[in-house]
């Protein structure tokens, strides 16, 4: 029988902890980028043309903020998937403990 178990119990538990932390952090970052937090301006990928040559500079900056916000939410979704994988590995490890050899 093929086993889907590929991580040990400690690695799977570590994966869950890191996934939970990553999801919380990235969702908060996504929310703060979505409300156009001025503190995060250094993380917005803009050029001088975006500021000086655009007739409506705030709109362009807001679009860039929202783009980074969406990227944070996508990364949080990936962390959720990896957390689910780690949770499945924990369950498989628990099941393996109770199996008769």
Swiss-Prot record:
GO terms for molecular function: RNA endonuclease activity. It is a multi-pass membrane protein. One of its GO terms (cellular component) is membrane. It is found in: Membrane. InterPro entries: Ribonucl_Kappa (IPR056552), RNase_K (IPR026770). The chain crosses the membrane at residues 13-33, 68-88. Keywords: Endonuclease, Hydrolase, Membrane, Nuclease, Transmembrane, Transmembrane helix. Its EC number is 3.1.-.-. Endoribonuclease which preferentially cleaves ApU and ApG phosphodiester bonds. Belongs to the RNase K family. PANTHER family: RIBONUCLEASE KAPPA. This is Ribonuclease kappa-A. It comes from Xenopus laevis (African clawed frog).
């Amino acid at each position: 029988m093929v086993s889907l178990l590929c991580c040990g119990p400690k690695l799977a538990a570590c994966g869950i902890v890191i996934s939970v932390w990553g999801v919380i952090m990235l969702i908060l970052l996504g929310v703060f980028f979505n409300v156009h937090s001025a503190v995060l301006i250094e993380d917005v990928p803009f050029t001088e043309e975006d500021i000086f040559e655009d007739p409506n500079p705030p709109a362009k900056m807001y679009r860039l903020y929202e783009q980074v916000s969406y990227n944070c939410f996508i990364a949080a979704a990936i962390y959720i998937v990896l957390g689910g994988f780690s949770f499945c590995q924990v369950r498989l490890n628990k099941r393996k403990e109770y199996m008769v050899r």
